[in-house]
């Protein structure tokens, strides 16, 4: 049986240096600001690319896939080629169409794939550091925050890229202690657009 813990790879969709204490607080404050902004959104539609790189024969072997995320309040639906994830706020479902298999669990911040809940997961248990800026493809400034877990056997570092103008997630990169690199990059991000409530119903799958 596949486990919901595997889905935390989504858990997602990364922040000039001051003294250590100052950069820690500045980076965490930015994450909190993005969290509050995301929480206030009525709806979200994100098209993303997920790329996983694993060490292979002295190099990195990568595979990429496309997906979409729809969110309305606490309700979330994620569609990919391999699976669908659905949360109605009380229960979470992991659906594998090819296997005609559905897994069910209680919905909480640990299983949710909503952008707000993913960001909330990083409010404690990590050290934070501002990690430079880049210019995105559309000319926007992307501020990065590096997070290191206080205690983790699986995650070495997480890099979160934030569009400083829109305060929306732009890219999420997770570096595993086993050398695996997982990247979720946002291809398009629409907010407060009309969404059909029925799409968050398990019976619509």
Could you say what each language-model-derived stretch is?
Residues 107-139:
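Flexible, surface-exposed loop/linker segments and immediately adjacent secondary-structure boundaries
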Residues 66-113, 182:
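An acidic-aromatic
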Residues 37, 66-70, 84-85, 129-136:
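Short, exposed beta-strand/loop patches in secreted or surface proteins that constitute
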Residues 19-61, 70-75, 204-205:
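N-terminal leader/targeting segments and the immediate start of mature chains
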Residues 65-66, 71-72, 86-88, 158-171:
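A short, surface-exposed beta-strand/turn
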Residues 1-10:
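Bacterial N-terminal signal peptides that target proteins for export
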Residues 9-18:
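Sec-dependent N-terminal signal peptides
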Residues 126-133, 137-204:
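Gly/Pro-enriched, hydrophobic low-complexity segments
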